[in-house]
């Protein structure tokens, strides 16, 4: 999703592969996968980010997701 990241592509790709394998193991359709991933993002924000920064970070994440979808399909 991010164009510039402080994380190495290899690390991101390995974690992504693991998450995809779990979703495939459970035969999760797209809508269930999105619910699970959305809940994961919410959990990360509420458990690891201060209340004063949650909305800002959620908006930045949402914007990056929308830009990623627009970029990949146009």
From Swiss-Prot:
Disulfide bond annotation, renumbered to this chain: none
SUPFAM superfamilies given in the database record: YejL-like (SSF158651)
Organism per entry: Mannheimia succiniciproducens (strain KCTC 0769BP / MBEL55E)
One family name in Pfam for this protein: DUF1414
Entry similarity comment: Belongs to the UPF0352 family.
Record's protein name: UPF0352 protein MS1910
């Amino acid at each position: 999703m991010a164009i510039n990241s402080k994380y190495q592509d290899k690390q991101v790709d390995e974690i992504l592969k693991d998450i995809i394998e779990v979703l495939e193991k459970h035969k999760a359709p797209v809508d269930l996968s999105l619910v699970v991933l959305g809940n994961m993002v919410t959990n990360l924000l509420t458990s690891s980010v201060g209340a004063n920064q949650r909305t800002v970070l959620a908006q930045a994440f949402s914007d990056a997701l929308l830009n990623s979808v627009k970029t990949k399909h146009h």
